[in-house]
Amino acid sequence: SFIGLIAPNIARHLGFIKAKSELIASCVLGALLLCVTDSLAIFLAQWSLDMIPTGTATAGIGAPALIIIARKQMSAQDQLFFSMPKGPKFISPVAYFLLGTMIFGLLALSSLSQPSSDMGYFVIPDAFEWSIRWPRMLTAIFAGGGLAVAGVILQRLVYNPLASPDILGVSAGAVLALIFSSLFMGYSIHSLSPWVAFLGSAIALCLLLFLGKKHQFAPSILILTGISLTAVLEALVQFSLTRVGEGKYTLLAWLAGSTYRVEPESATIMAVVITACIGVALLLSRWVTLIAT
């Protein structure tokens, strides 16, 4: 997902420069972006023969956004040194009001979108429709917020506005660990996924920092190293998927990043865990500030 890249850059552009305010703003923006993208995937599915995964829709929006950010915020001298972009020093109350109105409006639009309804594109869902819709919305909101907070921490850790879990190989490490545990150890991809994914992402991050230590974590070198690490890990994932039979179709559907058929229990557990992690990040916001200095 590109949420970890886009949301922090938008937050800084709006003027949320301090670590704590940037974490909060990025969390809200990330939750909003992924929720709206999920609703867009539902809306576009009416012209498709199958459901459009939210991960696919996010990549389709995030890739052009990455190009725009790189063209507008980077210059020729950034080949040697990247710097965190600065936004306006003061944020007017009108900006807060407009941002809050936009968030409320888009969330309302997301919750009311029912493209398959005979009564129109946007209707108030009944109890049955809402029982299917709310786990998907909850998953998109908290997953987006968690990815955005992870993006803020990584960008401040390496002092690079283009750093995000998917670009630096952290997400690829989590995916590879899950694939290995599912294919070669017999575990279900849903049973131990949080712990296995955390272990894989932690190993990938440690490897990235180890490789970047020689060049004193130079932002440009670290980005290239992260892209290379991502390519290697994704190649291993593709190779692993070619070694199995029909079970790979379940894994491919999972890799697409769909929020379809998310169970209420899984969505609730994920929301609680991500809320706790975001709370810890806010409590340690001063450390995040010191990291970026």
Place the predicted regions along the sequence by residue:
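Alpha-helical transmembrane segments in inner-membrane proteins
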Residues: S1-T293
